[in-house]
């Protein structure tokens, strides 16, 4: 679960290393974000020469959460960290590579470009 002020690891090669969630998109009373939700975030840590700079406000989609969640088949899944991929206005990733596994729920949310770039889909 991701909420305001949550820090997330960035799982792509845009140059950002860590972002801080400003808002979970999807309505005025949405408190928590789950895998597949889009957030507005601020870049807190970035590498020099990257596509995004520190302090930049970006949109990102959550690809991993440390809090376990249930699936319709009755199984549960959780990851070691909270991670997101920075996306543009067209919901396509701004980076060209994705690091680490991503959740299968992204397929249902129509983030097919992220699914195709990911090394592993769990």
From Swiss-Prot:
Q: SMART domains given for it?
A: Ribosomal_L14
Extract the PROSITE patterns matched here. RIBOSOMAL_L14
Q: Which SUPFAM superfamilies match?
A: Ribosomal protein L14
Single GO molecular-function term? Answer: large ribosomal subunit rRNA binding
User: What is the top-level taxon of the source organism?
Assistant: Bacteria
Q: Which cysteines are joined by disulfide bonds?
A: none
Q: Name one GO biological process term.
A: translation
Instruction: Give a single Pfam family match.
Output: Ribosomal_L14
Name of this protein: Large ribosomal subunit protein uL14
